[in-house]
């Protein structure tokens, strides 16, 4: 959605702000990413899935709205640097094994798929209703979430 809408905040932090990345996108992405890590590297999903996603999502909702993309890049970079420096952390030093239950894998994946489909349908219907191009226009400019991000960061 409208990558041209990304800008640098005007405050002293100079954060990268993407106001069109509202809560629905963040939650849909988080669910998709957790489902991926849970299904593909399940014994690491607590660290590289849940905790890593929460570390960028919590600040987005409670500290700096609109900066999720920057928070994600920073936390992912820190995690990768840490895990490359201490590769045995997730496997031997502090393992958190999962059940490897196929039903749990399916439920997490199905929930992720359902939420992401709802997000896509919402995004396309909003774009169509407001005659916006999803590749270059900001889609959510009329939403309260978008307006709040703009108000806090301009």
Residue ranges and their predicted role:
Residues 48-153:
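C-terminal transmembrane-bundle signature of multipass membrane proteins
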